[in-house]
């Protein structure tokens, strides 16, 4: 189960990265980025720090999923998964302009992976949690 959860976090990181890479091909996007903003949102130090924390979490969850004891592992995955879903919902209200189809496709895949992470962690066999936490 630990390896499976770690693999889901790795897949999620790839989706985040490729989604951002594809956005560079949108007309005018690179110009906005070099001017310090995107879709009406200006890049301040707090915004970029928040983005760094947000993007560091899946990488840390790969490590934590592989190394934490079962009980801690289970809750770390549930909490991190819910947090990322809330962020995904929150991003629907940020920015200006139309969202491109590829972006929505990646968001759907991200949501599916996050729900699967939560489901796997939630359904972690209870007898194994009791046995492995001793």
Residue ranges with predicted function:
Residues 24, 28-31, 70, 93-100, ...:
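Transmembrane helix-loop junctions in multipass membrane proteins, especially transporters and channels
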Residues 1-15:
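Cytosolic juxtamembrane helix and N-cap/initiation of the first transmembrane helix
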Residues 73, 86-106:
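Membrane-helix boundary connector in multi-pass membrane proteins
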Residues 12-46, 53:
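Hydrophobic transmembrane helix segments
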Residues 12-22, 57-61, 80-90, 109-119:
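Membrane-embedded alpha-helical transmembrane segments of multi-pass integral membrane proteins
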Residues 52, 105-112:
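Membrane-interface loop-to-helix entry segments
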Residues 56-75:
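Juxtamembrane helix-break-helix junctions at the cytosolic face
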Residues 112-134:
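Membrane-water interface at the C-terminal end of transmembrane alpha helices
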């Amino acid at each position: 189960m630990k390896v499976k959860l770690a693999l889901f976090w790795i897949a999620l990181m790839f989706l985040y990265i490729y989604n951002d890479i594809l956005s560079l091909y949108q007309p005018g996007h690179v110009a906005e980025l070099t001017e310090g903003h995107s879709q009406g949102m200006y890049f301040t130090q707090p915004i970029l720090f928040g983005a760094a924390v947000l993007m560091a979490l899946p990488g840390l969850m790969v490590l934590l999923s592989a190394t934490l004891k079962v009980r801690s592992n289970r809750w770390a995955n549930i909490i991190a998964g819910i947090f990322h879903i809330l962020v995904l919902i929150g991003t629907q209200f940020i920015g200006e302009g139309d969202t491109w189809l590829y972006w929505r496709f990646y968001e759907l895949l991200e949501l599916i992976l996050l729900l699967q992470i939560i489901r796997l962690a939630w359904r972690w066999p209870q007898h194994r949690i009791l046995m492995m936490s001793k």
